[in-house]
From Swiss-Prot:
Native species: Persephonella marina (strain DSM 14350 / EX-H1)
Domain S1 motif, first and last residues per copy: 626-694
Name of the featured protein: Polyribonucleotide nucleotidyltransferase
Stated role: Involved in mRNA degradation. Catalyzes the phosphorolysis of single-stranded polyribonucleotides processively in the 3'- to 5'-direction.
Compartments (UniProt record): Cytoplasm
Magnesium is among the record's keywords: yes
UniProt catalytic activity: RNA(n+1) + phosphate = RNA(n) + a ribonucleoside 5'-diphosphate
Chief place where the protein resides: cytoplasm
Amino acid sequence: MEGIGDITVEKVETKIQETPISIETGYFAKQSNGAVIVRQGETAVFVAAVISEEAQADIDFLPLTVDYREKTYAYGKIPGGFVKREGKPTVREILVSRLIDRPIRPMFPKGFFNDVIITAMTLSADDKYDPDVLAIVGASAALHITEAPFEGPVAGVRVCRLDGEFIVNPTYEQRNRSDIDIVVAGTKDAIVMVEGGSEEVSEEVILDAILFAHEEIKKLCDLQEELRSKVGKEKITVEIDEEDERIKAELESIVRESVKEAFNILDKKERNKRIKEIYEEAIQKIEIPEEKEKKAEVIYKEIVSNIMREKVLKEKVRIDGRRPDEIRPIWIRTGLFPRIHGSAIFTRGQTQAFVATTLGAPGEEQIEESIEEGEEKKRFMLHYNFPPFSTGEARPPRAPSRREIGHGNLAERAIEPLIPDEEEFPYVIRVVSEILESNGSTSMATVCGASLSLFDAGVPMKKHVAGIAMGLLKEDDDYVILTDILGDEDHLGDMDFKVAGTRDGVTSIQMDIKIKGLSKEILQEALEQAKKARMHILDLMYKAMPQPRPELSPHAPKVITMRVLPEKIPVIIGPSGKNIKKIIDETGVKIDLDQEGLVRIYAVDGESADKAKEMIERLIMDIELGEVYMGKVTRVEDYGAFVELMPGKLSLLHVSQISPERIRSAKEKIKVGDILTVKVIDIDEMGRAKVSLKEVREGEEPKNKFLFE
């Protein structure tokens, strides 16, 4: 860094598995509450934190917004497309924004309702280190040095396993060869967030990876403490509103017993209706100032949450009557609609996902710009939609939310390790999950429905994939782990822990918590309970559909793969692409060729694909004795004419074979450019053919007629 003028730079540095990571501040974005740059290798991420002076009124959540952007200048590129500037967030940027948000959010104290805005930008990106985990560290560090009551620090790292050894913050090249790729975030004392995928590894290996990552997380937390000791501001405290406390005390004394009774109602709608009635009755009995009416609703929700938690922790019976480890009833249907290539409905209690699979041809891949590869093609896509009617809400649908994009990515990651490679199954695959009904764990219903839908489509997956969402209620040392959580248990609980995989191991994992950490013992117990539940669901899925359908839908595109001699590829293409254009125009297919002799034909129906295959086979076939062909005259001499039967394959039509009558010169009957129908009467040892015009009988069809139509 070069320039003029005096600046003050505060910088701290540590090593993660011998790779330096540094955090610096002091000379940029000084009007924000806190700003840092985090570096690893030549990758650098800038993060700024701004906190509003006033709190929002009448809300019961932290108004935290995270915006992460990857600038193309960071890796020396100009944005593609017509508009040469960055636009709305990409899917990758949305996913990383969520990755930053989730470990940061639980670190703020209850009752803090000031707006918190985190802005992260990748300023430099090398071809080694992913900036996403650096952005987590940067967000925590930027908040930690501000006056905000942030109870961190937290740090995030990525852990992979290569040749049986764990690696923290690996390079892209190492990640591509590993069988685990998980982002872990935590404090010095506990794990806060887990997000990632693996190739059917055991729960024990996943737990070992998380704990291994935590040791490096501790170093990065110490690094942030060192930075705060140099530049940190005095933290503000969250003041308790005495009027809110009065309303809470009076309201709770009135509603407690009635709410406890309401939780004996097992039906969700009826239960929620009764809980609402209790509130309407209670507010008539206490004094609530007009400016506190909305806040009273927030306070009541908190009371209801606490009563539900107490009931489940004490009685070990959930609000729908289930035991903590009990899964709701499941029903499955496949092959629902004839025009869809593959379809399934997966229903678990009041959660229902309709999942459709569509098969496409090359060229229909999703193209995305990425830091790692520049332009990346996605052959397998999974999209998740959460319409308002699924929860009974009367509002119009909108564009996919960050949550929908995140849930789709989680399910896609769970299924992807089981998708056959392109050599085995040369289709582009798009899976769409429509949530028809929601009462918890829709992303895991999507995983189950997607696996069934792919089987129904005939995609040759070797195994089913299932997912389960686990929850947690914890008060001091007392806790209960919940299997297959409801929506209320998700909203009112302390953890949302999703695990997906096959009978042989985990393929995807995601954990979000609302408390300040999770111990090894609870994490281990949750993984074991999730495995048991997954096996139960997989048994039902295999019962419904034991294996992929042997045939694709008749409405799916037809793909034919051929192997030809590499020297035949130019013949298929023809001069200036003449031959391949003719095949495409006549059949409507797509054709992919490579120099190794691989030919792929893609068509909307089997008839078109078969016709294209036949045309290619005729084009590259060897000349056969006794067969009739059409050919173009390329040269004429007195003794005969040279006729091209196939591209580059000349035959001799001797003057004596032109007509039953005797003629002196071939030039009397034939000229260059004539199209003739001839029969092969001889092939010598060198493969040279002799043909006859006079031996052709009426009704004989030329084998290569299509070339001349």
